[in-house]
Amino acid sequence: MVLTRQVLEEVENTFIELLRSKIGPLVKSHAGTNFCSYDDKANGVDLVTALDKQIESIIKENLTAKYPSFKFIGEETYVKGVTKITNGPTFIVDPIDGTTNFIHGYPYSCTSLGLAEMGKPVVGVVFNPHLNQLFHASKGNGAFLNDQEIKVSKRPLILQKSLIALEGGSERTEGSQGNFDKKMNTYKNLLSESGAFVHGFRSAGSAAMNICYVASGMLDAYWEGGCWAWDVCAGWCILEEAGGIMVGGNCGEWNIPLDRRCYLAIRGGCESMEQKRFAESFWPHVAGELEY
Amino acid sequence: MTIDLASIEKFLCELATEKVGPIIKSKSGTQKDYDLKTGSRSVDIVTAIDKQVEKLIWESVKTQYPTFKFIGEESYVKGETVITDDPTFIIDPIDGTTNFVHDFPFSCTSLGLTVNKEPVVGVIYNPHINLLVSASKGNGMRVNNKDYDYKSKLESMGSLILNKSVVALQPGSAREGKNFQTKMATYEKLLSCDYGFVHGFRNLGSSAMTMAYIAMGYLDSYWDGGCYSWDVCAGWCILKEVGGRVVGANPGEWSIDVDNRTYLAVRGTINNESDEQTKYITDFWNCVDGHLKYD
């Protein structure tokens, strides 16, 4: 069975209601408090809060009650090597994206609720309660920011005139040509006059927020390695419904699965051929190949 | 002569919200033909709007404060424009012009005043997110015209420690040569687990907005070179009012002028103890790989 547009829209509205009435207020009221009570996840900068876990639990309870046959994948319950994205309808959820922002009170944390089917994102809702920005979309039904349809203004898409989202990431080990070194070298390539010489980079500290800003045309592209399916699923749907595309972060990867962990998001507001040329002009500046 | 700083702050707030803000918001993203700054690289974008807004600001402040000096980004002449002890408005009509051109919602107006070369009034207004941050010397800080309880905020933030901090960084528009290399090498050291191991870096593309966010307690510090007095003057005053501090970007530059062109801005701490700030600054400087130098 493939879900109809009407069902997708219903799921979208369920996400919106859940975020507006329950999750948003929780995230907003707790951001930037109790700094010392967080436990570290993979290393010193990958942070998990008790609230993150609690919120995921609330989301899971609500969604499985309403859609008991759908599968659920969340950041906090993910088990490496065990959790898999199948063809069935699957909720892919990040209770708090931008956890570091959340802990510091920097107003760019959000909740990201996505639904995938046949391994593709088909519903996405991203809510930043601090700035009251709610992005939402479902396949075939358009993309919206606070219930205003997202219409990306038409203009050329040129790498040398672009504003790109880049992040520091949580991998920090120098040397031996690891991902950290490749990322730093890629940033140099993109920024330098002898490289792409882009207009600038921005870092909001949240993959979902970055993708939504690309979707709305505020940014031209977002390049990142290391994020997970839950970081990108919702934003990916919003991006595509707004006319953008998602390709791989490594050279030549035009079609990637949701959990590829290495992404290049490119905005709409231009021809599809321009998007392809943008990717082709971007990829040579990627220093080496990111591996996850 | 005694200057009523609170009154000037109020005047600048109204100028920002009533006159400048609406222009920035309505014109953001509409500039298709960029006006390239003379002698600058293509990524340093000046729009006609920027110049018009500065003229509007200049006319408004001149009428109200005819004896005060004025320094603006658009009227600055290298080698000629100097900051004296006289009361001097230091103005960036649109900070974050690249954001402005791209309609990324973090362009703002930054209005500052120095007396005896010290920032004593600061007003920063981002009309896209309706955020007005202001302060005047001795009068604390206000967010959207309400006194901001920064002490509670600092309490919730905990200790100021480099490897628990979120740092704002900006590559700037100069993308070759020693300064660019120093910036990239320093970013790498700050992030690396062998050196700074900071929680992360952020960049929203506006120095003034960044300093406002530090004052609000959202970010811990901001390290940059290449910006001018008008980029930092307002933010500097606001930051000082909440216990923050501005030093140079290069090691050992504890005392700098507003036009130093390299800066490390650091947030306040709960007891406003200088030891914690001093240690943070020293640890940060240990990650600076090279030396930033601007004419």
Swiss-Prot record, chain A:
The gene is INM2. Responsible for the provision of inositol required for synthesis of phosphatidylinositol and polyphosphoinositides and involved in the inositol cycle of calcium signaling. It comes from Saccharomyces cerevisiae (strain ATCC 204508 / S288c) (Baker's yeast). Mg(2+) 2 binds at D94, D97, D231. The keyword Nucleotidyltransferase does not apply. One of its GO terms (biological process) is inositol metabolic process. This is Inositol monophosphatase 2. GO terms for molecular function: inositol monophosphate 1-phosphatase activity; metal ion binding. Its EC number is 3.1.3.25. It catalyses: a myo-inositol phosphate + H2O = myo-inositol + phosphate. Keywords: Hydrolase, Lithium, Magnesium, Metal-binding. Substrate binds at E75, I96, D97, G98, T99, D231. Signal peptide: none annotated.
From Swiss-Prot, chain B:
It is an enzyme of class 3 (hydrolase). Its EC number is 3.1.3.25. Keywords: Cytoplasm, Hydrolase, Lithium, Magnesium, Metal-binding, Nucleus. Coiled coil: none annotated. InterPro entries: IMPase (IPR033942), Inositol_monoP_metal-BS (IPR020583), Inositol_monophosphatase-like (IPR000760), Inositol_monophosphatase_CS (IPR020550). SUPFAM superfamilies: Carbohydrate phosphatase. Inhibited by Li(+) and Na(+). Its cofactor is Mg(2+). It is found in: Cytoplasm; Nucleus. GO terms for biological process: inositol biosynthetic process; inositol metabolic process; inositol phosphate catabolic process; phosphatidylinositol phosphate biosynthetic process; signal transduction. Pathway: Polyol metabolism; myo-inositol biosynthesis; myo-inositol from D-glucose 6-phosphate: step 2/2. Its main location: cytoplasm. Mg(2+) 2 binds at D92, D95, D231. GO terms for molecular function: inositol monophosphate 1-phosphatase activity; metal ion binding. Substrate binds at E73, I94, D95, G96, T97, D231. It holds the Pfam family Inositol_P. Mg(2+) 1 binds at E73, D92, I94. It catalyses: a myo-inositol phosphate + H2O = myo-inositol + phosphate. It comes from the Eukaryota. One of its GO terms (cellular component) is nucleus. Belongs to the inositol monophosphatase superfamily. Responsible for the provision of inositol required for synthesis of phosphatidylinositol and polyphosphoinositides. This is Inositol monophosphatase 1.
